[in-house]
Amino acid sequence: MKTVLKSTLQTALVASALTFATWAQAATSPLTVPGATTVNAAEAKQLWEDGAIFLDSRKTADWEAGHIPEAVHLDRKNPDVYNSDALNDLAAKDEAIVSYCNGERCLRSAKTAEDLVKLGFKKVYYFRDGFPAWNDAGFPIE
């Protein structure tokens, strides 16, 4: 009986660990987005200084708490503001657009970068580290 109980507990522990590992991995944004260029904070700052459009796809509360100056806010979870028409109206297809959100645990910027690439934008930049890295670097915020 003890052997069966021990085996059952071991199986349950392994299953729990695998479930947690899968969840943790799923909650991490990808390192790259096909068709987009991944940039770090310094590269994002240079793009900002060069006049690139910054697209913030975070929740409205996060946006209101602070964002990159002159960034466009389109809450990805709100279909009234985040849709293909809104994305197409952002810029010409050959203008630089930087997609960002709340860092590596935020999937919104990756999904937004994917959408921009699918819509035919040619200069899509994926700022994976997002607003936290920008803020930590001491760059301007609004």
Give a label for each model feature.
Residues 2-65:
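Flexible, polar/low-complexity N-terminal or interdomain linker segments that lie immediately upstream
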Residues 29-34, 76, 102-104, 121:
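Second-shell loop/turn segments in exported
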Residues 49-87:
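N-terminal, post-signal-peptide region of Sec/Tat-exported proteins
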Residues 50-51, 93-94, 137:
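Structured helix-beta-strand junction loops
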Residues 85-134:
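Catalytic cysteine-centered active loop of the rhodanese-like fold, especially the PTP/DSP P-loop
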Residues 139-142:
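Active-site neighborhoods of enzymes that stabilize oxyanions during catalysis
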